[in-house]
Amino acid sequence: MFPNGAPIGVPDPEETKALTQSRYDRRMDEDLYWEVGLLLEKLRQGLELGQAIISNETVGSMRSKEFEFSDDGEWPWFYNIHGAGLRRDTEIPTKVWFSLETIFNHRYYEHITHLYNIQRIKLAQGLNTTVEVPIEGYMALPGWDLSTP
């Protein structure tokens, strides 16, 4: 991924291994990452890593770079959103390949989904929201819960 070396500030190999072997698949390990300051630092670090990657890529290069992932059939709706950027291995049914473009689309869809849910919590608490979150990606799928208080 980084032929000239990793960008400054990325997790070191030990932390990367801990992140990939965490018992949680959808959140950071609360035994390692509990303090708000540390969580904000890791968020900043992740965003900066994404910016470093995108700044060195073109749309074409992002579409041509693929990464292996395991799929046990938990997310069938994923294929309805990502199209050509996600393909199942022809020989091993549980192996899928994501393009780098798809990974960044996924990040965007996840971020706006979480922002939408934060806004729902604010509305339930009687607080105002000031930004309209676009309903696209996963939230645009039929049956996605977009209810508000």
Segments (PLM) and residue ranges:
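A broad "ordered helical/assembly scaffold" signature
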Residues: 26, 30, 34, 38, ...
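A hydrophobic membrane-anchoring alpha-helix module
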Residues: 106-125
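Short, helix-capping/interhelical loops that line the mouth of catalytic, cofactor-
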Residues: 1-56, 60-61, 124-149
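Acidic interhelical loop/turn segments
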Residues: 48-105, 127-139
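Short amphipathic alpha-helical segments with heptad-repeat character
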Residues: 40, 44, 101, 105-108
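Generic structural signal for short, flexible, solvent-exposed coil/loop and linker residues
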Residues: 28, 92-93, 110
